[in-house]
Swiss-Prot record:
One of its GO terms (biological process) is N-acetylmuramic acid catabolic process. It comes from Petrotoga mobilis (strain DSM 10674 / SJ95). Residues 54-217 form the SIS domain. Pathway: Amino-sugar metabolism; N-acetylmuramate degradation. GO terms for molecular function: carbohydrate derivative binding; carbon-oxygen lyase activity; ether hydrolase activity. HAMAP family: MurQ. Disulfide bonds: none annotated. A lyase-type mechanism (elimination/hydration) is suggested for the cleavage of the lactyl ether bond of MurNAc 6-phosphate, with the formation of an alpha,beta-unsaturated aldehyde intermediate with (E)-stereochemistry, followed by the syn addition of water to give product. This is N-acetylmuramic acid 6-phosphate etherase.
Amino acid sequence: MLENLETEKSNPKTQNLDEMDIHEILRIINQEDATIALSIAENLENIENVVANCISAIKNHGRIIYVGAGTSGRVAVVDAVETVPTFGIDSGIFLPLIAGGEKAFFQATEHVEDYEESGKKDLEKNNVRSEDYVIGITASGRTPYVKGALSLAKEIGCKTALICNVKNPELMEFSDIVVSLRTGPEVIAGSTRMKAGTAQKMVLNMISTVTMIKLGKTFKNYMVDVKIMNQKLEERAVRIISEVTGLDKKTCKEYLIKADMKPKLAILMILSGKDKEFCIEALKKNEVLHEALKTLKN
């Protein structure tokens, strides 16, 4: 029963919410939000296992497919689309599927989450393969759209995971790993766009970010595979190259141009002292910059 879920219960701290002044409401929301990180900390081992599966899937030419409805679908879209400019990967490696399609991102279409068939069809339309890793996201742990997608993914032979906000979710049977972020009753009962949605977004950030780090998309703590799509990103790339190599920005921009606007390649050229073609070949063999650099220095 929906009413028995932790996310649907009334929060005893906010039962007189409508009578509180603005400052008191803000203080309580802030206090409740402070508990989110604790719910994530309890799941770090499971999140680590999800990341390991993401890395394996991408290395085997699979995709990471996020599946969600409503807020869960929207946070999935936000996380997935940002991986392209941040880490310079192809669009679709992180693929978000939201119940109701693209229009549901901008306009609430809550009824569309009620159909298992829709989840299955959306996976089929995107040619899901056994190499893909399918991650369902649902606060209640029981959304039919997500169930349809996860059940089909299991049939096909995909590894699967579930990110939810309740204990013992219904969709456990379709999930190899369950990340149960027990954020408890919301400030407004049942409004899972609040703590539950925030927790989901934080975990997706962790999953995509750590996956990309371990696949060589950073050097130290710099996004060296950033895709230069505008002036701001070009300036950032030049600054990254300068901070990593110690060279002045003018020289770094010259190297960036020589490296076809690829910061990682420019850095390797500078730090190794090797020419462009040599460095391109080194990165083909090993995309992890610090490892490629060791190879060239040996």
